[in-house]
A protein has these predicted regions:
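Beta-strand/loop substructures that line and gate deep hydrophobic ligand-binding cavities in soluble
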Residues: 3-6, 135-194
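Hydrophobic ligand-binding cavity/cleft-lining segments
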Residues: 2-100
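Short, highly charged C-terminal tails/helix-capping segments
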Residues: 196-215
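Amphipathic alpha-helical protein-protein interaction segments
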Residues: 54, 58, 65, 111, ...
């Protein structure tokens, strides 16, 4: 059955639009927090340490996927094609770069969200350790200074079944005026969870198709 993205309007909470957001001044960091409660290899653990300012929040979402890491990474690493699994993305256009670190993309989102578009910069693309990070640097939205880090890890328990993956995605973002940290965390967590569940469906189907072809 094809995956249908949930209606965004029921998940808005108090994050209502108030107009354009320009690149905001970063809040002075007061703490460096490990947002991930999930155990990750030491080689990538530092990527989930976020400097959290007094008007910011951070969180982590973990998603197991019944597909090998290389299959999941082939989808995640495509900075130019987030709509492959992010169903809140309407379109994406690369404006600078060719997919390497420093690449800029313009993302337009579906109607119903408190946003219209965002400009995002690729900060990390590590094909060896399976790490991708980007930050929002402009656009019309409510998530100023948003920075996301995604890491992929092999799931040893699923090795006998052809391999499995654990995806860990953490982020830090400014709390919009008129909202609380909890408002912001619940809203962004909901979006990230929807994205990662869609990633699981997409890559599990991809892995199954590859397995059928090789049978």
């Amino acid at each position: 059955m094809p995956y249908t993205a949930p209606k965004a309007s029921v998940q808005l909470h108090r994050l209502t639009p108030t107009g354009s957001v320009v690149p905001a001044k970063s809040s002075p960091p007061t703490d460096t927090s490990r947002c991930s409660a999930h155990a990750v290899p030491e080689s990538v653990a530092r990527h989930h340490n976020h400097a959290v300012g007094p008007n910011q929040c951070c969180s982590t979402v973990v998603q197991p996927i019944a597909a090998p890491v290389h299959s999941v990474w082939s989808v995640v690493r495509r900075f130019d094609n987030p709509q492959a699994y992010k169903h809140f993305v309407k379109s994406c256009h690369v404006v600078v770069g060719n997919g390497d670190v420093g690449t800029l993309r313009e993302v337009r989102v579906v109607s119903g969200l408190p946003a219209e578009n965002s400009t995002e910069r690729l900060e990390i693309l590590d094909d060896e350790r399976h790490v991708l990070s980007f930050r929002v640097i402009g656009g019309e939205h409510r998530l100023a200074n948003y920075r996301s880090v995604t890491t992929l890890h092999a799931e040893p328990a699923a090795a006998a079944a052809g391999g499995g993956t654990v995806v860990v995605e953490s982020y830090v973002v400014d709390v919009p005026p008129g909202n609380t940290r909890e408002d912001t965390r619940v809203f962004v967590d909901t979006i990230v969870k929807c994205n990662l569940k869609s990633l699981a469906r997409t890559t599990e189907n991809l892995a199954a198709a590859c397995e059928r072809l090789s049978a």
